[in-house]
Amino acid sequence: ALVKAIAKACTHTRYAYENMLASLSQYTKRELCHLMGAGYAGFLEENCDLDIKCPVLILVGERDEMGKVKQYCSAWQENTGYPLHMIKGAAHNSNVDNYEQVNMEIEEFTEALPE
């Protein structure tokens, strides 16, 4: 039940859901809980002002309901001016839900970078 709940929470398309189920099915409930705890602890620890020395592109699924990801991404964009693009028809795993748009956004971003 935990694997299905996680897969449902972070995906929007059937393909992404099945992909997430396959990825998570290798873990026990205890391992999943440990990984989630470690991930959140690391996020809280790393959620600070950063001085990033390379170009940044922020991508977030328009249907991302994981925690406050959309809020954080919007605030990050407002505070830094980094470009933020919403991925249509995608949840937290936007690169699987809508890989075509994700790839297009990355390609356009990298092509526009100065040489």
Per-region residue spans from a language model:
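Conserved alpha/beta-hydrolase catalytic His-Asp/Glu region
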Residues: A1-D51
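Hydrophobic alpha-helical packing elements
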Residues: L32-L35, Y72, V102
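Conserved loop-alpha-helix segment in the C-terminal half of the alpha/beta-hydrolase fold
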Residues: P55-A90, V96
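Post-His helix in hydrolase/transferase enzymes
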Residues: V96-T110
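Alpha/beta-hydrolase-fold serine-hydrolase catalytic core, especially in secreted/extracellular enzymes
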Residues: P114-E115
